[in-house]
From Swiss-Prot:
Organism: Clostridioides difficile (strain 630) (Peptoclostridium difficile)
GO CC terms in record: plasma membrane
DNA damage keyword on record: no
Cited function: Catalyzes the initial step of the lipid cycle reactions in the biosynthesis of the cell wall peptidoglycan: transfers peptidoglycan precursor phospho-MurNAc-pentapeptide from UDP-MurNAc-pentapeptide onto the lipid carrier undecaprenyl phosphate, yielding undecaprenyl-pyrophosphoryl-MurNAc-pentapeptide, known as lipid I.
Similarity comment text for this entry: Belongs to the glycosyltransferase 4 family. MraY subfamily.
One Pfam family linked to the record: MraY_sig1
Pathway it works in: Cell wall biogenesis; peptidoglycan biosynthesis
Bilayer disposition of the protein: Multi-pass membrane protein
An MF annotation (GO) of this entry: metal ion binding
Cofactor(s) this protein requires: Mg(2+)
Protein name: Phospho-N-acetylmuramoyl-pentapeptide-transferase
């Protein structure tokens, strides 16, 4: 049975309330057990004042989304895949955060370790979806009524896209309220899309829960942040975006609705490639949100403008699929 906007609003409200109830209890615990963010010296100098801010606050959002998802609808295939994406990628992020903070390894998981875990989970999600849904390999093409059937190539294509999305969302989490605000808007789009065009109640519920969780978390994470989501939260949100798009066969809309994620990841690739080729930097700093900071923009201005851009991209995405 499809849920209307009223029921989805209730769903978002439940997740929101869970976050704002748990937050004031959990954040002091993070501070007590010294789960504080270590700000790197090679980042923007204005961020040094954030050193020691509690991190791994993404756990709050994960708990809220899981509880809401499990209680609002009967759990079947799509809800199970969605929760696995969120909890699974969130757990990889948790390992990364824990190693950084408690084992004092500044970069967390080694790059190959992180990629192996992400690829393994993405293979599970892609393979499970391909073998469980007869329409999984039919990808919707934005701005048209056509779909493209990629057949068995669905698995490697989805693996690449899943890993790319998760890491792009992770890169977006560099300013107070940026990743949570952008993902809130992205989740609103998928909530509307899943509940109307795609006809997928479970994805609509997951998206609504993510809307509520992100909105509640913004109360603690907006500038000046009382807590950071950490890789725990950013990878979990990446897993949520993966679930929304994969389960509605709409991954090709991600470069539009997720344009900020795409720009953040692309800026890093350009910076690294350009530096290797010329020994010079293309941007003043990457990801691109730091470039604008280095240009003199206040952090709050960068975040607000990126939110506005995402709202515009959401409107364009609505035109593309409705």
């Amino acid at each position: 049975m499809m849920l209307g906007i009223t029921e989805l609003t209730y769903t978002a409200l439940i997740a929101f309330l869970i976050v704002i109830i748990i937050g004031p209890i959990f954040i002091p615990m993070l501070r007590k057990f010294k789960f504080g963010q270590t700000v790197r010296d090679d980042g923007p100098q204005t961020h040094l004042a954030k050193n020691g801010t509690p991190t791994m606050g993404g756990i709050i959002m994960i708990v809220a989304i899981l509880i809401t998802g499990l209680t609002r609808v009967k759990v079947s295939h799509d809800m199970a895949v969605g929760l696995i994406c969120i909890a699974g990628f969130g757990f990889i992020g948790f390992l990364d955060d824990f190693i950084k903070i408690k084992l004092k390894r500044s970069l967390g998981l080694k790059a190959y370790q992180k990629i192996i875990l992400q690829v393994a989970l993405s293979f599970y999600v892609a393979f499970y979806q391909y073998t469980s849904s007869s329409s999984a390999s039919q990808l919707m093409i934005p701005f048209t009524d056509f779909v493209i059937n990629v057949g068995i190539l669905y698995i490697p294509i989805m693996m690449f896209i899943i890993v790319a999305i998760v890491n792009a969302v992770n890169l977006t989490d560099g300013l107070d309220g940026l990743a949570s605000g952008v993902t809130l808007i992205v989740s609103v789009f998928f909530m509307l899309f899943a509940s109307s065009i795609a006809g997928n109640t479970e994805v609509a519920v997951l998206a609504a829960a993510t809307v509520g969780a992100c909105l509640g978390f913004l109360g603690f994470n907006s500038y000046p942040a009382r807590v950071f989501m950490g890789d725990t939260g950013s990878m979990a949100l990446g897993g949520a975006v993966v679930a929304f798009s994969v389960l509605t066969n709409s991954v090709l809309i991600i470069p539009i609705i997720g344009g900020i994620y795409f720009a953040e990841a692309l800026s890093v690739l350009i910076q690294v490639g350009y530096f290797k080729a010329t020994r010079k930097r293309f941007f003043k700093m990457a990801p691109i949100h730091h470039h604008f900071e280095q240009c003199g923009w206040p952090e709050t201005r960068v975040v607000f403008i990126f939110w506005i851009i995402t709202v515009v991209l959401a409107w364009i995405s609505i035109i593309a699929v409705f």
